């Protein structure tokens, strides 16, 4: 299991090194001499953000699995929403602790052996099961680059890194239908423009059977849970690995997922 995740990590790093310079080179001259607020920061003007957002939106809609484009879209359109989410975190004791301590979810911070040793049904064990079953790695989340505020940059980075945790909480797979359902939940929870766009336009690639289930059952379920649950960014998941997943769902007001979701795509 750990070997699978490490292989995914190496593959992502290889792809990232090949694709990332494209954007960096285009903006390096414009940002030369500007003050960098965090290691991967690329300062951009409002016009540059608008152009980046337009291009990223087109690519993300064409191929929703282009996580790099989804990331750019989120960073260039979500400034006001990120401020609201940051303020929500500051008002909550657990959220404020997260903002202060800045935990990261990656292969370098996760103790895979410990997660594997946790009881069946615990958050940590189920999260690891999700990663393994779907062949995904927490290291596939792109670093924040285009947010011109160090604290807000962490907020959107945290949102990205708990995305797979939301899949685990909601019981959603990583196929297109599962991603759309999670996007509806995230859209209600966060209000981020990229989540709203993903929720609205993601269904265009689904089959008729999946669309019927999506609109009749899954979207209402996701909206209801998104409204009922407190801000999911205020959950210090790393301190709750041993908590039973069912207990955490009850605490957050998240009802069990529909059982037939796994057979659809």
Swiss-Prot record:
User: How would you summarize the oligomeric state and partners of this protein?
Assistant: Component of a multi-subunit COQ enzyme complex, composed of at least COQ3, COQ4, COQ5, COQ6, COQ7 and COQ9.
Q: Which family does it belong to?
A: Belongs to the COQ4 family.
> Would you tell me the Gene Ontology cellular component terms?
extrinsic component of mitochondrial inner membrane; mitochondrial inner membrane; mitochondrion; protein-containing complex; ubiquinone biosynthesis complex
Location of this chain's protein in the cell: Mitochondrion inner membrane
Keywords per UniProt:
Lyase, Membrane, Metal-binding, Mitochondrion, Mitochondrion inner membrane, Phosphoprotein, Transit peptide, Ubiquinone biosynthesis, Zinc
> What is the native source organism of this protein?
Rattus norvegicus (Rat)
State where the transit peptide lies.
1-29
Q: Which residues carry this modification: Phosphoserine?
A: 108
Principal location listed in the UniProt entry: mitochondrion
Write out the function statement from the record.
Answer: Lyase that catalyzes the C1-decarboxylation of 4-hydroxy-3-methoxy-5-(all-trans-decaprenyl)benzoic acid into 2-methoxy-6-(all-trans-decaprenyl)phenol during ubiquinone biosynthesis.
Q: How is the protein disposed in the membrane? A: Peripheral membrane protein
Q: What is this protein called?
A: Ubiquinone biosynthesis protein COQ4 homolog, mitochondrial
Which residues participate in Zn(2+) binding? 163-164, 167, 179
Pathway the protein acts in: Cofactor biosynthesis; ubiquinone biosynthesis
Checking PANTHER family in the record gives: UBIQUINONE BIOSYNTHESIS PROTEIN (PTHR12922), UBIQUINONE BIOSYNTHESIS PROTEIN COQ4 HOMOLOG, MITOCHONDRIAL (PTHR12922:SF7)
Reactions it catalyzes:
4-hydroxy-3-methoxy-5-(all-trans-decaprenyl)benzoate + H(+) = 2-methoxy-6-(all-trans-decaprenyl)phenol + CO2
List required co-factors: Zn(2+)
Q: Name one GO biological process term.
A: ubiquinone biosynthetic process
EC no. given is 4.1.1.130
GO MF annotations, alphabetized: 4-hydroxy-3-methoxy-5-polyprenylbenzoate decarboxylase activity; carboxy-lyase activity
């Amino acid at each position: 299991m750990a070997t699978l995740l490490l292989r995914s990590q190496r593959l992502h790093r290889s792809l990232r090194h090949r694709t990332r310079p494209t954007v960096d080179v285009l903006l390096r001259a414009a940002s030369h001499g500007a003050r960098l607020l965090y290691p991967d920061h690329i300062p951009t003007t409002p016009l540059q953000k608008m152009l980046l957002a337009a291009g990223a939106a087109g690519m993300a809609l064409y191929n929703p699995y282009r996580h790099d484009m989804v990331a750019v879209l989120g960073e260039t359109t979500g400034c006001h929403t990120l401020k609201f989410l940051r303020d929500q975190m500051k008002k909550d004791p657990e959220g404020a602790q997260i903002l202060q301590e800045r935990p990261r979810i990656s292969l370098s911070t996760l103790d895979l052996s410990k997660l594997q040793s946790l009881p069946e049904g615990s958050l940590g064990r189920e999260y690891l099961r999700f990663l393994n079953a779907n062949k995904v790695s927490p290291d596939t989340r792109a670093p924040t680059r285009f947010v011109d505020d160090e604290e807000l940059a962490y907020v959107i980075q945290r949102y990205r890194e708990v995305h797979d945790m939301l899949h685990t909480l909601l019981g959603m797979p990583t196929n297109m239908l599962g991603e759309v359902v999670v996007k509806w939940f995230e859209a209600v929870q966060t209000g981020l423009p990229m989540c709203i766009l993903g929720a609205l336009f993601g269904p265009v690639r689904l089959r008729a059977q999946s669309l019927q289930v999506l609109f009749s059952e899954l979207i209402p379920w996701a909206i209801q849970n998104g409204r009922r649950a407190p801000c999911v960014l205020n959950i210090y998941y790393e301190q709750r690995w041993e908590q039973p997943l069912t207990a955490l769902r009850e605490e957050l007001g998240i009802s069990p997922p529909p059982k037939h979701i796994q057979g659809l795509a």
